[in-house]
Regions:
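Extended terminal accessory/targeting regions
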Residues: 2-12, 20-151
Length: 151
């Protein structure tokens, strides 16, 4: 008798629990996601620093649903002639992927490409003389490539 009563109560309770789980509201993306994305995709050094810190601590930002994936500098060298362009490319990819997901890529592409150029130029500041000129020239070339062919 006890087993029948337990079995009779178990099925409805399981069904109720499943319904409650299915009916639980999905986590909403924070309302300030566009502002955070904009803040992290500016030409200023602070913008890059904030993005790099967030990238290093992605789990803190998981509710925002940002796309952190990157192929770095795509088919171009990530560190041409030893110049450290890899993270500038990752920052650029972050901007492209997330503005595409937001449906506002075309309006933001010029700024994202300028941000990329600013990041590359900052990567060149550690050099002097001919080496700096070479780095700046490569930064300009990478910038022109994304400006013209980036999509």
């Amino acid at each position: 008798m006890f087993r029948r009563r337990t079995a009779a109560l178990t099925a409805p309770l399981l069904a109720l629990a499943a319904t409650m789980v299915a009916a639980a509201p999905a986590q909403a993306v924070p309302a300030d996601k566009p502002q955070v994305l904009t803040r992290w995709t500016q030409t200023a050094p602070a913008s890059y620093t904030q993005w790099a810190d967030a990238r290093a601590h992605r789990t803190k930002w998981s509710a925002y649903g940002f796309d952190w994936s990157t192929d770095y500098c795509t088919s171009s060298p990530d560190n041409p002639l030893g110049f450290p362009f890899r993270m500038s490319c990752a920052h650029h990819d972050f901007g492209y992927r997330n503005y595409k997901a937001a449906g506002t890529f075309a309006a933001n592409k010029p700024r994202l490409d300028s941000m990329f150029h600013a990041d590359l130029r900052r990567a060149c500041t550690r050099y002097t003389g001919t080496k700096k000129k070479s780095c700046d020239a490569l930064a300009w070339t990478y910038y022109q490539a994304v400006k013209r062919f980036g999509h």
